Design a protein with these regions (language model features):
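Glycosyltransferase catalytic domains, chiefly GT-A lineage
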Residues: 1-479
């Protein structure tokens, strides 16, 4: 998700940020007290207050609204007609909202101030006690960051959510994954993050102990008792031993015990640029997710922003959940070709399609996640991406290598179709900027504005028609 440096800093874990508040965590009382149960019930009821079956959520603030709008247009060219929520934290201009709500090419969209809702939420049976923040200013301070994504899940009117970062460009329609076995069985689908920073973030060690991380400590102290009255999708008991020297109060999954983060190979686990979440199927996990950002003693787990919170919530809810079959990839122009499974590519994040295919060569490039989606020019300089690698593969530590440079990989150059599609997305973004320029620049001359606006609408429609025709040629992977 593209954020400026101030907003990104607000979400960083550090001695003065998020996960150092672990000491405030749920104490593990044998019998949850009334206040805890009231809070949990409130979180559950707020999150389950849905009115639409399924939709897309793209959190925004003013500088990235055009990027989000161009993403919606891109998705519409892929046949995606799902409604879209654009939650913000009081930092999107009314003029921007009014402009884009008038554009029929965008389909069904809704802007709303999620921080206003969060600031007004009180505990059931104790209306003087706020749930997320004491007032709107506190909500602005708290949620004008990556954490807006968490409350966007909580307050979404959609039962089934596909959350996407605005700075994402797709090459295959993501809504295919609503039909995947992974999603249908669990109501979740999470993407893997880089295997890096093995002594930082989730993997930062506690008090110099080389065998205990902040993730270990948080999860060992978490008390699931207040949440156990909420339904969950029960999973089988783990068959693997716990490699960490901590005792857990919940039943862990084999996925956790075998994960790269739990085994101290990485400080990251989830790339939340795309995330599927069914609030009705994952009721307990959704309440736990909400509790991470509530004014309570639960505290927020160790994570770079919101990324890992969906994973923590699922694991602590003792529910079934699903991850991509494939490791995170990369996209960039700096490719060192040393042959298959031996090359290096430096660049930004990319994901291949998350469902295993008949062979690695059949797994297509799925999406890019970077504000550089607007700047790559494959027709001028070759752009490469990392081909599929299974998520359970541990390539080894980065050592002196840059985290942005996955190694031991197989790379591929953008195909003409991929290059054309990316160019189309970039042109869609330029046209959304033109929409906004015309609105502000011609305000004093309504007739001229209408003429220019219709012309811009025509350009958008024409480009979208071309992109639809091109997308019909895409080979659709198996789900």
């Amino acid at each position: 998700m593209y954020l400026d440096s101030r907003l990104a800093w607000d979400a960083l874990p550090s001695p003065t940020h998020g996960f150092r508040s672990i000491a405030r965590m749920v104490s593990g009382d044998p019998q949850p007290n009334t206040k805890k149960l009231q809070l949990v019930q409130t979180l559950h009821d707020v999150a389950q207050n849905t009115s639409l079956p399924r939709g897309i959520v793209i959190p925004v603030y003013e500088p990235i609204v055009n990027l989000a709008v161009s993403l919606i247009l891109e998705l519409r060219t892929m046949g995606v007609d799902a409604p879209v929520e654009l939650p913000h934290c009081g930092d999107v201009k009314i003029e921007s909202q009014e402009l884009f709500l008038q554009k029929t090419a965008l389909g069904s969209i809704r802007f709303y101030d999620v921080c206003e809702l969060a600031a007004a939420t009180t505990v059931q049976g104790n209306l003087s006690t706020k749930v997320f923040c004491e007032d709107i200013e506190a909500c602005h301070s708290k949620f004008r960051s990556f954490d807006i994504k968490v409350i966007a899940v909580v307050f979404s009117k959609f039962e089934e959510i596909m959350m996407v970062d605005a700075d994402t460009a797709f090459f295959v329609s993501p809504t295919l994954l609503w039909g995947s076995e992974k999603y249908k069985e669990t109501g979740t689908l999470l993407m893997n993050d880089r295997i890096a920073h093995e002594i930082y973030f989730m993997a930062e060690r506690v008090g110099g102990d080389p065998s205990v991380s902040y993730q270990h400590r948080y999860m060992s102290r978490f008390d699931p008792a207040p949440f156990r009255s909420i339904p969950t999708l029960e999973r089988p008991k783990a068959t693997l031993p716990n490699p960490a020297p901590v005792k857990l109060k919940f039943e862990p999954s084999d996925f956790l015990l075998n994960s790269h983060s739990w085994n101290l190979r990485t400080g990251h686990q989830v790339d939340s640029s795309l995330m599927f979440w069914n609030k009705k199927k994952q009721q307990r996990a959704t309440a736990i997710l909400a509790s991470f950002k509530a004014l309570s003693d639960v505290g927020s787990p160790p994570s770079y922003g919101d990324k890992e919170l969906y994973f923590y919530a699922s694991e602590l809810a003792e529910t079934q959940y699903a991850f991509s079959d494939h490791a995170i990839g990369a996209v960039g122009t700096e490719y060192r070709d040393y042959g298959d499974h031996n090359s290096t590519l430096c660049g930004d994040m990319a994901q291949v399609f998350p469902i295993r295919q008949a062979s690695e060569d059949d797994v297509p490039l799925f999406y890019l996640n970077s504000d550089r989606v607007l700047h790559f020019k494959p027709e001028v300089e070759p752009v490469y991406y990392m081909k599929a690698r299974m998520a359970n593969v541990y390539p080894g530590p980065f050592g002196e290598r840059r985290m942005e440079c996955p190694f031991g990989i197989t790379g591929a150059i953008f195909s003409p179709a991929e290059a054309n599609h990316l160019a189309g997305r970039q042109q869609l973004h330029k046209l959304t900027v033109e929409w906004e320029r015309l609105t502000h620049g011609s305000a004093g001359d309504p007739d001229t504005r209408k003429t220019l606006d219709r012309a811009a609408d025509g350009l958008v429609d024409g480009l979208m028609h071309e992109m639809r025709e091109q997308y019909r040629q895409v080979v659709i992977p198996n789900v």
